[in-house]
Curated annotation (Swiss-Prot):
Span of the signal peptide: 1-21
Protein location: Secreted; Target cell membrane
InterPro entries, per the entry: Cytotoxin_Cobra (IPR003572), Snake_3FTx (IPR003571), Snake_toxin-like_sf (IPR045860), Snake_toxin_con_site (IPR018354), Toxin_cobra-type (IPR054131)
Chief location bin: secreted
S-S pairs: 24-42, 35-59, 63-74, 75-80
GO molecular function terms noted in the UniProt entry: toxin activity
Main function: Basic protein that binds to cell membrane and depolarizes cardiomyocytes. This cytotoxin also possesses lytic activity on many other cells, including red blood cells. Interaction with sulfatides in the cell membrane induces pore formation and cell internalization. Cytotoxicity is due to pore formation, and to another mechanism independent of membrane-damaging activity. When internalized, it targets the mitochondrial membrane and induces mitochondrial swelling and fragmentation. It inhibits protein kinases C. It binds to the integrin alpha-V/beta-3 (ITGAV/ITGB3) with a moderate affinity.
Name listed for the protein in its UniProt record: Cytotoxin 3
Lineage: Eukaryota, Metazoa, Chordata, Craniata, Vertebrata
Gene3D superfamilies in alphabetical order: CD59
Transport is among the record's keywords: no
Family: Belongs to the three-finger toxin family. Short-chain subfamily. Type IA cytotoxin sub-subfamily.
Gene Ontology cellular-component annotations: extracellular region; membrane; other organism cell membrane
Amino acid sequence: MKTLLLTLVVVTIVCLDLGYTLKCNKLVPLFYKTCPAGKNLCYKMFMVATPKVPVKRGCIDVCPKSSLLVKYVCCNTDRCN
């Protein structure tokens, strides 16, 4: 009986994500990655001249400043980029 209870506890811990992990889209939005610890923002980078076509997506710790040529959009919810 103790073995069964211990097994259920272990399976529950393995199946549940006990710590919150952010998921961000990769360049192709069908695919995503789980962000490592400390990277708590998703970002999308694109050229100002072609704002509809993202150049890069992923996880980041601090949102970079946009420039005249490159724009960054950052967010902090799952797959928001």
